[in-house]
């Protein structure tokens, strides 16, 4: 579990670093879509 969290955190940091240094709009959009998908999966549908 700890290893997963470390890898996940490291991945996020590297991703943010790359996004800041290389302005790639498509990649940013893709990351936002993935983030929204993860958030949707985390929360049970309240409808």
From Swiss-Prot:
Tissue expression from the record: Expressed in monocytes and dendritic cells.
Primary location: mitochondrion
Family label: Belongs to the STMP1 family.
Species whose genome carries this gene: Homo sapiens
Keywords per UniProt: Immunity, Innate immunity, Membrane, Mitochondrion, Mitochondrion inner membrane, Mitochondrion outer membrane, Transmembrane, Transmembrane helix
Record note on quaternary structure: Interacts with components of the ubiquinol-cytochrome c oxidoreductase (cytochrome b-c1 complex, complex III, CIII), such as UQCRC1/QCR1, UQCRC2/QCR2 and UQCR10/QCR9. Interacts with components of the cytochrome c oxidase (mitochondrial respiratory chain complex IV) complex, such as MT-CO2.
Compartment list: Mitochondrion inner membrane; Mitochondrion outer membrane; Mitochondrion intermembrane space
Lineage: Eukaryota, Metazoa, Chordata, Craniata, Vertebrata
GO biological process: innate immune response; mitochondrial cytochrome c oxidase assembly; mitochondrial respirasome assembly; mitochondrial respiratory chain complex III assembly; positive regulation of interleukin-1 beta production; positive regulation of NLRP3 inflammasome complex assembly
UniProt name for this protein: Short transmembrane mitochondrial protein 1
A single Gene Ontology CC term: mitochondrial outer membrane
Bilayer topology annotation: Single-pass membrane protein
Regions crossing the membrane: 7-23
Induction remark: Down-regulated by bacterial lipopolysaccharide (LPS) in monocytes and dendritic cells.
Pfam families hit by this protein: DUF4535
Gene: STMP1
Protein function: Microprotein involved in mitochondrial respiratory chain complex III (ubiquinol-cytochrome c oxidoreductase) and complex IV (mitochondrial cytochrome c oxidase complex) assembly. Required for the formation of mitochondrial supercomplexes (SCs). Also required for the activation of the NLRP3 inflammasome.
InterPro entries linked: STMP1
């Amino acid at each position: 579990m700890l290893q997963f969290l470390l890898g996940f955190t490291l991945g996020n940091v590297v991703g943010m670093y790359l996004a800041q240094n290389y302005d790639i709009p498509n990649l940013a959009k893709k990351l936002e879509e993935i983030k929204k998908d993860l958030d949707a999966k985390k929360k049970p549908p309240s409808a």
